[in-house]
Amino acid sequence: MISARRLGKRFGRKRALDRVSFDLAKDGFLLVTGANGSGKTTLLRLCAGLAAATSGELEVRARREEIGYVGHEPLVYRELTALENLTLFARLYRVPAGEARVGMLLERFGLWEERGSRAGDFSRGMLQRLALCRALLHDPELLLLDEPYNALDARGAEVLDRELKDLAGARTFVVATHDPDRVSALATARLAFA
């Protein structure tokens, strides 16, 4: 599903990625580890089509609408409620039976009781859970998760563990994390940045 050959990205004089190569088959799970500033986020942004490489080749065999992405900062509208956020994205993604899917995801991620609350009033962990719901809303083939456990409380982390285990092998994942032990058993490929 993803092939990278000598992939590079520079920001001015700073080299964010240098000659990264890997292949990830459909339904594979790539675990990306490394220190802060090592290029994990840059790699995910390139795979999501949010940035362009400055060298090398990258082939992502998924259309934009088949990709779910969760970055460092949860992409949600803080002035909208949890329900309004997901309903809006369901319309944007043209999700069939969007109402049912929205309700199911809010329930699975422990946000059903908070569905009428403004996202701006949520804790960082709740915002992360809402962003994960948004990323899963359109049932994407490829999920790109940048530090998905960041700011999750114990309940949120357990929910994410369950979701990843349920979807592993049926979806393609690229997960960048400082906590590789949580998802190590799911990985079919690994990429470690220095």
Describe the role of every protein-language-model region:
Residues 132:
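Hydrophobic anchor residue at the start of the ABC signature
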Residues 87, 97-114:
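Conserved ABC ATPase "signature" region
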Residues 143-147:
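Catalytic Walker B motif of ABC-type/P-loop ATPase nucleotide-binding domains
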